[in-house]
Amino acid sequence: HADSRLGERWVKSLLQIIQKKSSKDFAWYFDFKIKKNKLENRILELAVALRSHFLQRPYGDQGLLIHKDLYFLSGGFSDLKIMEDLDLITRITKKNKAKRIEEKIFTDDIKWSKSNIINRAIKNARLRRKWRQGYDIDKLSKEYYS
């Protein structure tokens, strides 16, 4: 996620987290923010926050922080063209909780501005559903990048 940048206070926040012994038992994620101030961006940010909190599904563009022991216990990243972050967090949250880091991670709006943001979010949700149903990852990757 090369288009994402952390906010100014991220180092201080991460130090507070990693200094606590219990923090290694959780996957951590930042607050997803899109740089441009548009209503549809704020709606998407709210949807991401709700999904992350209630469904325990933060994705890679939220800057996942995972202790190496938890990472390896969960099997690490699978060799997937797409959905590798979803695959990892799904395995982690079967036994462990994902917790919010109260700091922002800013994502460029380029990929979101190329198409209607609502249509893009729906397309992504459909791709995730197909992935969970076992569709071929190569076909899903082609569909994602089309």
What function would you assign to each model-found segment?
Residues 82-88:
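Acidic donor-binding loop at a coil-to-helix junction in glycosyltransferase catalytic cores
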